[in-house]
Regions:
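The feature captures the LRR N-terminal capping module
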Residues: 1-45, 49-65
Length: 65
């Protein structure tokens, strides 16, 4: 599992899979910094009430859960 701190610090550049399951209440906008590489995004177990309208910016994303 990855941490929000790693994401915000830019330490996850180039990854293809991101696991931010559990403990989020808002969608981290920093995820868009990974748009060139991110294929799998795990947001399960979070208290997200919605996803951003511009989620389509993650053009390589194939799996979202």
């Amino acid at each position: 599992m990855h941490t929000l701190a790693q994401l915000r610090a830019g330490a996850l550049a180039g990854i293809t899979r991101l696991d931010l399951s559990d403990n989020l209440s808002e969608f981290p906008r920093e995820i868009f910094d990974l748009a060139d590489s991110l294929e799998v995004l795990n947001l399960s177990g979070n208290a997200l009430s919605s996803l951003p309208d511009d989620l389509h910016r993650l053009t390589r994303l194939r799996v979202l859960f």
